[in-house]
Design a protein with these regions (language model features):
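N-terminal cap/lid segment of alpha/beta-hydrolase-fold proteins
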Residues: 132-173
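Accessory cap/linker subdomain of secreted extracellular hydrolases
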Residues: 223, 286-373
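Primarily recognizes the serine-hydrolase "nucleophile elbow" in alpha/beta-hydrolase
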Residues: 248-312
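Short beta-strand/loop motif that positions the catalytic acidic residue
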Residues: 374, 380-382
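Cap/lid segment of the alpha/beta-hydrolase catalytic domain
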Residues: 181-241, 310-313, 421-432
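Catalytic active-site module of serine/aspartate enzymes centered on a nucleophile-bearing elbow/loop
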Residues: 415-418, 424-453
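Short solvent-exposed beta->alpha transition segments
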Residues: 34, 45, 49-94
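Alpha/beta-hydrolase active-site loop
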Residues: 234-256
Length: 453
C-alpha cells in the first residue's frame, strides 16, 4: 500500500485542504462508494484481477493482483474471517476522494479506506480503525452551568443560509461577542477533526467566562456541490468561501439583544486567521471591536501546501520514489498557479482544489502588511509545535506589527495547530487519533484580551 497514505488522507484537512468541496456523508449509491464496495466484494471472493481492475498505475505496480492475494491471505489470521460490509461514507483529504466502508471481521470491525484519484482510479487502500462518533469531552475550564446554547441561522434570508450555534452566558447582559472563522476545507461549526472539536472548546470556555460565542457551518461544507455547479464557480474567491459569511455572523450578533453591539470580535483560525486583515477591511462599516489570529498563515498557500506534503512524506525518515513523484506533480501545480495571468480568472478548471480566480485573488496578499491598515486591537496566537502554520509565520506577524499599540503576541511552546498541547515531533496523529482540548492558557488569553477591550 502507499507509504504514508494514512498521513496524506487523514491529516491534510486542518490547515490546508483548501477548497475541498465535499460533505462528509453521502448516499450509498454514490459512484465511488459503489466502486469501493465492488473492490471489497472482489477481495472477499478471491477475484484479485477484478479487485485490481480500477487501480491506477502506481497501485497496479506496488499492489497488483499477486500482492493483493498475498495480503488477503494474511487477513483471516490477523482479523478473523470476513463477515460483511455495513455503513459507508465519503471524505476528501489532500486532493484525494475517499470512500470508507465499514467491514465486520470475526475479531474486529474496521473501516476500509479506498482512495480515488482525479480519474476515479484507486490510488490507495488500507484498513483503519472504525471509530464511532466521539462523544464530546468538555475541557475542565468549560462549565455548562454558566451558559446556554441556541441554534441560529447565519445569513438567514440570503442565498447561503448557514446553521450555527450561539453559546451565550447566563445572566443579565449585554455580553461581549465573538465570531469564530474556520480554517481551510469544508469544516463544521466545531472545526471537528477526529475526536477533537477546537471551536467548541473555545466557545464553551469563553461562554463560561462571560463571552458569547457564535460558530457556524462553513459554506463549502453545506453547499459544496451547489457551489461547484454554480456558473459563478469560476470566479469564486475567499470572499465567497469565507469573508462574506464571517461578516454575516457579525451582523447576526449585532442584532441579538443580549450582545454588546460595540464589543463584537472576530477570531480566525488557520486560513481564517490569514484572512483576518481582509475581513477587518471588508467589515469596516460594522465597527468590529477587535480581531484574534490563531495560527494565521503568512506564506502563499500553494507553496505552503508543497511544504506540508514534503513534511508529511518525510515523517517516517525517508521519502520514497513514489512520494518524490507526487511532490514533483505538486511542484508543477504550484508553478502553474504562479504562472497564471489575469485573463485566466474566468476558467473553471481546478488547480490544487480551486479555480484560477481563487489563486489570482490571493496573489500578492501578505496578511501582516494588510493588517497595518486595521486600526483595531489584535491578538496573534501561535503554537510552537505547529508544522502546518509555523513559528516563521508568527515571526512575520511580529516583524510587521510588533510594537504597534493594541497588538499582542502569544506563543505556546507545547501547542500544535489545534492549540492542544503535546510533546515530541508533531504529526497528524495528534488530530485524528488523540483527543486534546484547546489549552486552558490559550482560552484564558483570548478571554483577557476581549474583556479588557
Amino acid at each position: 500500500m502507499l507509504k504514508n497514505l494514512a498521513v496524506l488522507l487523514l491529516f491534510c484537512s486542518a490547515a490546508l485542504s483548501l477548497l475541498s468541496f465535499q460533505q462528509g456523508e453521502v448516499a450509498p449509491e454514490d459512484e465511488l462508494i459503489v466502486k469501493a464496495r465492488a473492490f471489497l466484494k472482489a477481495l472477499e471472493k478471491g477475484d484479485f484481477e477484478a479487485a485490481a481492475k480500477d487501480f491506477d498505475a502506481t497501485m497496479m505496480k506496488v499492489s497488483g493482483p499477486e500482492k493483493l492475494a498475498e495480503f488477503w491471505k494474511q487477513v483471516p489470521e490477523k482479523l478473523g474471517s470476513f463477515k460483511k460490509q455495513t455503513a459507508a461514507r465519503r471524505d476528501q483529504f489532500g486532493g484525494y476522494e475517499v470512500a470508507l466502508v465499514t467491514c465486520e471481521f470475526e475479531k474486529v470491525t474496521l473501516d476500509a479506506r479506498v482512495v480515488f484519484d482525479k480519474e476515479k482510479k484507486i490510488a490507495g487502500f488500507q484498513f483503519v480503525p472504525s471509530l464511532p462518533p466521539a462523544k464530546y469531552e468538555p475541557p475542565a475550564y468549560a462549565d455548562p452551568a454558566k451558559f446556554e446554547e441556541r441554534e441560529v441561522t447565519v445569513g438567514a434570508g440570503g442565498d447561503w443560509p448557514l446553521q450555527g450555534t450561539l453559546a451565550i452566558p447566563k445572566g443579565v447582559g449585554p455580553f461581549p461577542g465573538l465570531v469564530l472563522v474556520h480554517g481551510s476545507g469544508p469544516n463544521d461549526r466545531d472545526e471537528t477533526i477526529g475526536p477533537n472539536q477546537p471551536f467548541r472548546d473555545v466557545a464553551w470556555g469563553l461562554a463560561s467566562r462571560g463571552i458569547a460565542v457564535l460558530r457556524y457551518e462553513k459554506r463549502t461544507r453545506i453547499y459544496g456541490p451547489k457551489l461547484v455547479a454554480d456558473p459563478k464557480f469560476a470566479s469564486l474567491t475567499v470572499k465567497e468561501e469565507t469573508i462574506d459569511d464571517a461578516l454575516e455572523a457579525v451582523r447576526l450578533l449585532k442584532s441579538t439583544g443580549s450582545i454588546d453591539r460595540k464589543r463584537i470580535f472576530v477570531l480566525g483560525h488557520s486560513l481564517g486567521g490569514m484572512l483576518i486583515p481582509r475581513i477587518a477591511l471588508a467589515g469596516k462599516d460594522l465597527d468590529i471591536a477587535g480581531f484574534i489570529v490563531m495560527a494565521g498563515l503568512t506564506s502563499p498557500l500553494p507553496e505552503t501546501y508543497l511544504r506540508q506534503m514534503t513534511y508529511l512524506f518525510a515523517l517516517d525518515g525517508e521519502t520514497s520514489a513514489d512520494e518524490k513523484k507526487q511532490l514533483d506533480e505538486i511542484k508543477k501545480d504550484v508553478d502553474r498557479i504562479n504562472a497564471l495571468r489575469e485573463s485566466d480568472a474566468g476558467k473553471a478548471e481546478k488547480m490544487i482544489f480551486a479555480p484560477p480566480a481563487y489563486w489570482l485573488d490571493l496573489r500578492g496578499y501578505y496578511p501582516p502588511d494588510v493588517a497595518m491598515k486595521v486600526n483595531r486591537p489584535m491578538l496573534i496566537l501561535q503554537g510552537s509545535r505547529d508544522y502546518q502554520v509555523t513559528t516563521e509565520d508568527f515571526e512575520n506577524w511580529k516583524k510587521t506589527l510588533g510594537g504597534r499599540p493594541g497588538v499582542e503576541f502569544k506563543l505556546y511552546p507545547k501547542a500544535n495547530h489545534l492549540f492542544a498541547e503535546g510533546q515530541g515531533l508533531p504529526s497528524p496523529d495528534e488530530y485524528s487519533l488523540v483527543h486534546g482540548s484547546v489549552a486552558d492558557t490559550v482560552v484564558s488569553d483570548i478571554a483577557l484580551f476581549i474583556l479588557k477591550h
